[in-house]
Amino acid sequence: MISRLRGTVLEKDLEDATIDVGGVGYRVNFSSLALGKLPAEGQPVDVRVRTVVREDAFDLFGFLTKGEEEVFLLLNSVSRVGPRLSLMVLSGMEVPELVAALSRGEVARLAKIHGVGKKTAERLVLELKDKVKTIHLEAVSRGTAPAAVSGAHADLVSALLNLGYKQPQAEKAADLASERLGAEATFQALFREALKALRSGG
């Protein structure tokens, strides 16, 4: 099975990216957070990969860090949570923030992630609350709090820049998304709102 890809970013979409390795293009699914942090098209990249094989599909799921990959595997082990939903969860929070929310049993916060809901959030906490404590993430061990608004804003602008938008466009869209959704919104929600603003011209 493919476990790592080192090559060039060929193209990026909203949910996946194609990585050129020796003339072969691999389409890899990423969380929206990871996708926003990928290098620009034409730039070199090195990502960790998990291969999921089903009767009708052969999918690759990519990660920028070992911690992200470990959390994906834990999420995917939960009953009725497949790889796609696992990526949606990873799109809702940075990994240290997500691990902290799971370990503290923050059901309400997890339920706000797009595609999760209360029942799934309760199941995630029930099955993973103790398991995530075995993941040794430096930021979590220090008791990291959720990212500050300024940090989230910078991450959002960076993600938009990596999709090819210009700095003024990205800044304006990030500001609009923050104004419309408020400080409690997840990164994924802000990202979608910013893209909507860019496509509609603000």
From Swiss-Prot:
GO terms for cellular component: cytoplasm; Holliday junction helicase complex; Holliday junction resolvase complex. Pfam families: HHH_5, RuvA_C, RuvA_N. It is found in: Cytoplasm. Signal peptide: none annotated. InterPro entries: DNA_helicase_Holl-junc_RuvA_I, NA-bd_OB-fold, RuvA, RuvA_2-like, RuvA_C, RuvA_C_sf. Transmembrane segments: none annotated. Residues 143-147 are annotated as: Flexible linker. One of its GO terms (molecular function) is four-way junction DNA binding. Residues 148-202 are annotated as: Domain III. Keywords: Cytoplasm, DNA damage, DNA recombination, DNA repair, DNA-binding. Residues 65-143 are annotated as: Domain II. One of its GO terms (biological process) is DNA recombination. Belongs to the RuvA family. Homotetramer. Forms an RuvA(8)-RuvB(12)-Holliday junction (HJ) complex. HJ DNA is sandwiched between 2 RuvA tetramers; dsDNA enters through RuvA and exits via RuvB. An RuvB hexamer assembles on each DNA strand where it exits the tetramer. Each RuvB hexamer is contacted by two RuvA subunits (via domain III) on 2 adjacent RuvB subunits; this complex drives branch migration. In the full resolvosome a probable DNA-RuvA(4)-RuvB(12)-RuvC(2) complex forms which resolves the HJ. The RuvA-RuvB-RuvC complex processes Holliday junction (HJ) DNA during genetic recombination and DNA repair, while the RuvA-RuvB complex plays an important role in the rescue of blocked DNA replication forks via replication fork reversal (RFR). RuvA specifically binds to HJ cruciform DNA, conferring on it an open structure. The RuvB hexamer acts as an ATP-dependent pump, pulling dsDNA into and through the RuvAB complex. HJ branch migration allows RuvC to scan DNA until it finds its consensus sequence, where it cleaves and resolves the cruciform DNA. Has three domains with a flexible linker between the domains II and III and assumes an 'L' shape. Domain III is highly mobile and contacts RuvB. This is Holliday junction branch migration complex subunit RuvA. The lineage of its organism: Bacteria, Pseudomonadati, Myxococcota, Myxococcia, Myxococcales. The gene is ruvA.
